[in-house]
Regions:
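Secretory-pathway luminal glycosyltransferase catalytic domains
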Residues: 3, 39-146, 155-158, 248-250, ...
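Short hydrophobic segments within beta-strands
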Residues: 8, 118-120, 151, 224
Length: 256
């Protein structure tokens, strides 16, 4: 038996981390071989050349985009293809410390007593998942941090420019994601590390910032939820994204 990860073609680094990690955990539970393509941002190489033919396989996508029946997959007498997004925090919480080692996370804290805010813009405007200026302004005001640093995929966006020029925020790095790439460039990795190692962070509804929150050692994590927005619903259904966690009692749900 074996577990094979089949990355979704539309998935970027964060989404691929979910698929890879789900496959990694499942292969450990099944005590079987694990095959996957590369995650070069974490120096994980592909080993797909040895995968061979599939045997009585089942696809995780058969359960849905996010939901999967772990017990059934573990007991399945055959191969498992991980081809869904599997974005449920409960799949990963028990393995957090092991995953920190897997992804080579350091025991580092920076930006103490500051809030680092992630703003995902670009494609989120198109898919109606962008939280918007009013949301971020209220979050910043309610959080009461004297200094706010913005990590974003588009420093030219009206929202980001307004937060910098009118509300006193500063930028961690400058730039715009113009083209889709499945792996992150050096600027994006710098932003990821800033989020992961900062003392206090407010994430966006993105897998990129979720992994930074989950793997880091934070004093405060603010999770964003917006009433009426289907992306990351505040009350998720069976096959919705459900990534809220509060492992160390440091996490806050921020809903407007």
């Amino acid at each position: 038996m074996k577990v094979i990860v089949k990355y979704d073609p539309a998935g970027r680094m964060g989404n691929r981390m979910f698929q890879y990690t789900f496959g990694y955990i499942l292969s450990k539970l099944k005590n079987c071989s694990f095959y996957h393509d590369s995650l070069p941002n974490f120096k994980i190489s592909s080993n797909l050349e040895g995968v061979g033919n599939l045997n009585n396989h089942i696809n995780t996508r058969s359960y849905g985009d996010q939901y999967a029946d772990i017990d059934m997959l573990v007991n399945h007498e055959g191969d498992v293809v991980v081809d869904s997004f599997v974005q449920k925090s409960r799949f990963y919480i028990d393995y957090r410390e092991e995953l920190k080692s897997l992804f080579k996370v350091k025991d580092t804290i920076v930006n103490k007593k500051k809030l680092v805010l992630h703003i995902r813009e670009t494609d989120y405007v198109t898919i109606n998942a962008f939280l918007g200026y009013d949301y971020y302004k209220k979050l910043i005001g309610d959080s009461k941090y004297a200094e706010v640093i913005i990590v974003t995929d588009n420093t030219k966006s009206d929202t980001v420019q307004k937060l910098v020029n009118e509300d006193g925020c500063t930028l961690s790095t400058e730039g715009t994601v113009d083209n889709f790439t499945v792996h992150s460039d050096s600027r994006a990795i710098d932003d990821f590390k800033t989020l992961m190692y900062s003392e206090n962070i407010a994430i966006s509804q993105s897998s990129f910032s979720w992994w930074a929150a989950f793997l880091g050692n934070h004093k405060k994590i603010i999770f964003p939820f917006k009433t009426g927005l289907d992306w990351w619903p505040a009350s998720p259904g069976k096959d919705d994204i459900d990534l809220y966690f509060n492992i160390d009692k440091v996490t806050q749900k921020y809903i407007i």
